[in-house]
Amino acid sequence: MKKKTPIKPQLTEPVTSDFYLEDEMMFEGLSASNLDYSYLTCNNLILRDTKLERITMQKTRLERFECSNVLFKNCDFSNLEWLAGSFHQVWFDQCKLIGTNFAESFLRDCTFSNCVATFASFSNTNLKTVDFSDCQLVDSEFYEINWKQLTLTKNKLTGSNWFRTPLNGLDFTTNTFDKIALSQEHMTGLIVNQEQALTIAAGLGLVIV
């Protein structure tokens, strides 16, 4: 099957305007930068056709969040709770996603490039045409994800958890890890290089001589 690449956000000169967190708000055609909304909670926030740059939302909780055709650039979303969110045609570029929780979210046509996502959780997510490239995904969670057209390129995957995730057709070869958690019954069809195969085998308790 030919690999598809995510559709990047198509933004036509978003208007610089105020951005803030408030329940039931929808922002469309917006550009905002250099704002801090950490330690807040917001429900049913919607972003469309928007660019957010250097926005900080540490330990913020966004419930039932929805965004489409959005660029997040140089943002700090460390420990942000994005549970059960919806992300369509979204690009995270050079963002800090340390401990960010995407659990149970739906992501389609999403790109993560040059992000620091150590301890981030994508557990129980639905990923369709999603690309991670040059990201730090150390100790990240990809537990029991449902994926189609997932691409991983030059990421650091040491300590990442892929338990109960079917891996048939997933290509790890350009990524690096010295330990990784996989379910043996779901490893059929996983594409790895020789060094990675030895690392995985050692993790399963095999003694290689």
Model-based region annotation:
Residues 3-209:
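Tandem repeat scaffolds
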